[in-house]
Amino acid sequence: MTTEDPDSNHLSSETGIKLALDPNLITLALSSNPNSSLHSPTSDEPVPESAGKADTSIRLEGDELENKTKKDNDKNLKFLKNKDSLVSNPHEIYGSMPLEQLIPIILRQRGPGFKFVDLNEKELQNEIKQLGSDSSDGHNSEKKDTDGADENVQIGEDFMEVDYEDKDNPVDSRNETDHKTNENGETDDNIETVMTQEQFVKRRRDMLEHINLAMNESSLALEFVSLLLSSVKESTGMSSMSPFLRKVVKPSSLNSDKIPYVAPTKKEYIELDILNKGWKLQSLNESKDLLRASFNKLSSILQNEHDYWNKIMQSISNKDVIFKIRDRTSGQKLLAIKYGYEDSGSTYKHDRGIANIRNNIESQNLDLIPHSSSVFKGTDFVHSVKKFLRVRIFTKIESEDDYILSGESVMDRDSESEEAETKDIRKQIQLLKKIIFEKELMYQIKKECALLISYGVSIENENKVIIELPNEKFEIELLSLDDDSIVNHEQDLPKINDKRANLMLVMLRLLLVVIFKKTLRSRISSPHGLINLNVDDDILIIRPILGKVRFANYKLLLKKIIKDYVLDIVPGSSITETEVEREQPQENKNIDDENITKLNKEIRAFDKLLNIPRRELKINLPLTEHKSPNLSLMLESPNYCNALIHIKFSAGTEANAVSFDTTFSDFKEVEDFLHFIVAEYIQQKKV
């Protein structure tokens, strides 16, 4: 109860006069006037005990909150009518109030956003101390009296207005503190740990998981018992059986029998003991045999490994390139050796030049299997992979438009050497080097012959090239050892051009070596190296040989023309042939690299073969009384295949003497020009 004098200046308009009443001395009956504001069902603050036992939700919203409040107020009115005292002790109300009613009151007092899990005793004590330190001692005493009166007014049965949202009200703090007392009346002051929301949610989730797990296990046990019970009492088992189990499993499908235990006799004990010992002895014997077999197997593997590495150490030198590789067929890890010519200047990419090193247990030897043909085992690859180049010469029959075989290159083949090649790994490496060399030679020949089709060169298939000349035909073919032409013609008689075919094959191989050396020189001299070879300038294998043969035919034809149009007409004339030397390139000047100098020297050793042939045919004409005519012809092949004739003629040494200096590429024009010179200048002068 409060009183307020508006004319008094010393009274606070907010607090008024505070009275302290003993609730135990007041026994006035509560007025039952329905028009009283205390009995209004629309009161904003209901008595705390009206929280509703059935509703455990913390916050009510909208119409539900209003309906709930009205029902609680009606219950409180009925409760208060049975009371004789006007004011009740707050402790008697809140101390015995259940948590499901007390917690919503605390949440409404604390305001929105407050969580009950964050409330603890230490925080309440701090709030009480903070309120005590804000005011003076006198003011605190007055406030205590006022608070005591407020408690009686707020908690009393008259339902005076109470602000439950006042967070600074110490009465609420004391009520909350009183609620935390245990059954013995002692306050739990030892709780220092504050549980966060995340910890609470985690523990709640763990608890639910354990509960669900226990429920599942108990359900399974119940299902098992129900199914087992259905065989005895079907109705009882079906009543406790789940619908799913009742649908899936037929009732009475599970049964159980009680088997009586019969103690074994002494004799059975002895027999069982003997049987156990027998099984143990048999297991020990089998384990012994298994260990002995494993030991023998490991010993054999270890011995094979020792032999393998000893052979590797004896057969492989420091110059060989050894590395690890995985077999394509079996996936087994093996050692591989590089036998190709990539480091020597080879640009062949169709064969990597790698062979797997395998230990042949049967022959106790090491076998080299090319990585590109690793499907072959043992020594089968010698007959299936080994290839060689063969050159055959065919001579044209004059009476018939046909050719006859007049020469064939011979392959070095010795049965004893082949057997040694399969046993010695060094011989196998040499054999593989020959194979890849022959394959690259055929590859470069086909690449060059693609530009020589207009000169009678044709590519019949991927392993055969044919060069046709007026009177001869050359056939270059890559064959394997099991080819029919090799097997069926091993005992052929020697032919007239066999030596020539062998020399031609040697020349082809030497020209490939020259290409290797030129590639190495380009790699050393150029910072980027030579990646692709230029067919016109770098690949010179067929053209030098073809140029030599065609140049010899051109020279014979030119001599025949000179004989017919000059020598036979001009008596006393003769012809002199002179080879024109090519100027040496100045490649070694200002070169400090010894490797380049050495390569240039080795390449110049093949100049006799690689240089474009040039011949000077000088015709010696008879001298006249006043004139000394000179006639000379220069024959050369600028691109190894075509012929170019350079003719010079001078009628005398005088300044006004007639002279000619012209070049022809057609022999018919040469005939006409020689006939013109002889008829107009040589015979006329002679006459």
Swiss-Prot record:
InterPro entries: Mediator_Med17. GO terms for molecular function: DNA-binding transcription factor binding; RNA polymerase II complex recruiting activity; RNA polymerase II core promoter sequence-specific DNA binding; transcription coregulator activity. Present with 1720 molecules/cell in log phase SD medium. Component of the Mediator complex, which is composed of at least 21 subunits that form three structurally distinct submodules. The Mediator head module contains MED6, MED8, MED11, SRB4/MED17, SRB5/MED18, ROX3/MED19, SRB2/MED20 and SRB6/MED22, the middle module contains MED1, MED4, NUT1/MED5, MED7, CSE2/MED9, NUT2/MED10, SRB7/MED21 and SOH1/MED31, and the tail module contains MED2, PGD1/MED3, RGR1/MED14, GAL11/MED15 and SIN4/MED16. The head and the middle modules interact directly with RNA polymerase II, whereas the elongated tail module interacts with gene-specific regulatory proteins. Keywords: Activator, Nucleus, Transcription, Transcription regulation. GO terms for cellular component: core mediator complex; mediator complex; nucleus. The lineage of its organism: Eukaryota, Fungi, Dikarya, Ascomycota, Saccharomycotina. This is Mediator of RNA polymerase II transcription subunit 17. Component of the Mediator complex, a coactivator involved in the regulated transcription of nearly all RNA polymerase II-dependent genes. Mediator functions as a bridge to convey information from gene-specific regulatory proteins to the basal RNA polymerase II transcription machinery. The Mediator complex, having a compact conformation in its free form, is recruited to promoters by direct interactions with regulatory proteins and serves for the assembly of a functional preinitiation complex with RNA polymerase II and the general transcription factors. One of its GO terms (biological process) is transcription initiation at RNA polymerase II promoter. It is found in: Nucleus. Residues 30-70, 130-189 are annotated as: Disordered. The keyword Transcription applies. Belongs to the Mediator complex subunit 17 family. Residues 30-43 have a biased composition (Low complexity). Residues 56-70, 136-147, 167-183 have a biased composition (Basic and acidic residues).
